[in-house]
Swiss-Prot record:
This is Chaperone protein DnaJ. PROSITE patterns: DNAJ_1, DNAJ_2, ZF_CR. Residues 5-70 form the J domain. Binds 2 Zn(2+) ions per monomer. Homodimer. The gene is dnaJ. Participates actively in the response to hyperosmotic and heat shock by preventing the aggregation of stress-denatured proteins and by disaggregating proteins, also in an autonomous, DnaK-independent fashion. Unfolded proteins bind initially to DnaJ; upon interaction with the DnaJ-bound protein, DnaK hydrolyzes its bound ATP, resulting in the formation of a stable complex. GrpE releases ADP from DnaK; ATP binding to DnaK triggers the release of the substrate protein, thus completing the reaction cycle. It comes from Bordetella pertussis (strain Tohama I / ATCC BAA-589 / NCTC 13251). Transmembrane segments: none annotated. Pfam families: DnaJ, DnaJ_C, DnaJ_CXXCXGXG. GO terms for biological process: chaperone cofactor-dependent protein refolding; DNA replication; protein refolding; response to heat. The keyword DNA-binding does not apply. Zn(2+) 2 binds at C175, C178, C197, C200. CXXCXGXG motif repeats lie at residues 158-165, 175-182, 197-204, 211-218.
């Protein structure tokens, strides 16, 4: 899951002062502190998130890197991208092992085997951040699938400076600290360790005259419109991955991905269970007693169902293949209709008199008309005997 924007986490504007940041952090820390919420995992996560955001935005250098490159600019693991061992070794050790380890041992192996480092002569490359978008759809849309258009907030390259961060008519200058490599070397004992340049933060460039549209960041926050295909049968909580539609990479790095998370609205009639559907079938007590034909709703229209005489509440009727065909399913699920016998209300005196006559006729017939009631009465008598 992609990290939230640090300014959004603290609830402050991008131009917030140090004092505003401090106040916002203190407020959140007081609210979500584990001592105040000992049994809340959510509060613990929010406390950690606020702490992480303030540790970056409360530091002038880290904040500048974050404003320019987003999360990648303050991620210590991102520095390893673009490193690696080539030449006589023929293999790669970049990225996953981390910059410090790969750089230190890369120099040793280079001296022994004559291997040259690839990627060490240019600025650090960062993959763009992934984006997450929550999409709410209906059960009918989930069953049939559809194409839709969404607007996703994202950092995009500035249209004015085309991502350079420099004012029109100027260009970034080579970083004086690292000479344009985006990295500096530090001697630690026998090892020569390469680290991201603290001045240019891995870009290899310095901006002396920043672009007024993006304040030298090279990127602006805006909504981008994307087409998304929702497959038929998708279920609540599933995610659709749109490769390359996340935030753009930095220094030529690959873009991130977009993850669309599906949330299905509660339906007025149906409840979904996998590929099956369930609904309540409310019938009058006369139909339950005498039987009859009823029409029941399905996602594909109406269906006929036969109600046998003497149907009781709780009986379930199964309509095969009237459910949903799942994303990977070969056949649709079933529809289960659960009977609820409705007792009439607000009866007239005449209707009540008819029912009393009906009740008397049932009593004359003994227990054969109400076997379940007789069984329940016998169990109650046994309980109290």
């Amino acid at each position: 899951m992609a990290k939230r924007d640090y300014y959004e986490v603290l609830g402050v504007a991008k131009n917030a002062s140090d004092e505003d940041l401090k106040k916002a952090y203190r407020k959140l820390a007081m609210k979500y502190h584990p001592d105040r919420n000992p049994d809340s995992k959510e509060a613990e996560e929010k406390f950690k998130e606020a702490k992480e955001a303030y540790e970056v935005l409360g530091d002038e250098q880290k904040r500048a890197a974050y404003d320019r490159y987003g999360h990648a600019g303050v991620d210590p693991n991102a520095a390893g991208m673009g490193g690696g061992m080539g030449g006589g070794m023929g293999g790669g050790m970049g990225g996953g092992m981390g910059g410090g380890f790969a750089d230190a041992f890369g120099d040793i192996f280079g001296e022994i085997f004559g291997a040259g480092r690839r990627g060490g002569g240019g600025p650090q490359v960062y993959r763009g951040a992934d984006l997450k978008y929550a999409l709410e759809i209906t059960l009918e849309q989930a069953a049939s699938g559809f194409d839709t258009e969404i607007r996703v907030p994202s950092w995009e390259n500035c249209d004015t400076c085309h991502g350079s961060g420099a004012k029109a008519g100027t260009s970034p200058k080579t970083c004086r600290t690292c000479g344009g490599s985006g990295a500096v070397r530090m001697q630690q004992g026998f090892f020569s360790v390469q680290q991201t340049c603290p001045t240019c933060h891995g870009t290899g460039k310095e901006i002396t005259d920043p672009c007024p549209s993006c304040d030298g960041v090279g990127r602006t926050r805006r909504n981008k419109t994307l087409q998304v295909k929702i497959p038929a049968g998708i279920d609540d909580g599933m995610r659709i991955r749109s490769s390359g539609n996340g935030e753009p990479g930095i220094n030529g790095g690959p873009p991130g991905d977009l993850y669309v998370e599906i949330h299905i609205k509660q339906h007025k009639i149906f409840q979904r269970d996998g590929d099956d559907l369930h609904c309540e079938l409310t019938i009058p007590f006369t139909t339950a007693a005498l039987g009859g034909e009823l029409q029941v709703p399905t996602l594909g229209g109406k269906a006929e169902i036969s109600i046998p005489e003497g149907t009781q509440s709780g009986k379930t009727f199964r309509l095969r293949a009237k459910g949903i065909r799942g994303v990977r399913g070969s056949y649709p699920g079933d529809l289960y209709c659960h009977v609820v016998v409705e007792t009439p209300v607000r009866l007239s005196d005449e209707q009540k008199a008819i029912l009393r006559q009906f009740e008397a006729s049932l009593n004359d017939g003994g227990d054969r008309h109400s076997p379940q009631s007789k069984s329940w009465t016998d169990r109650v008598k046994e309980f109290f005997s």
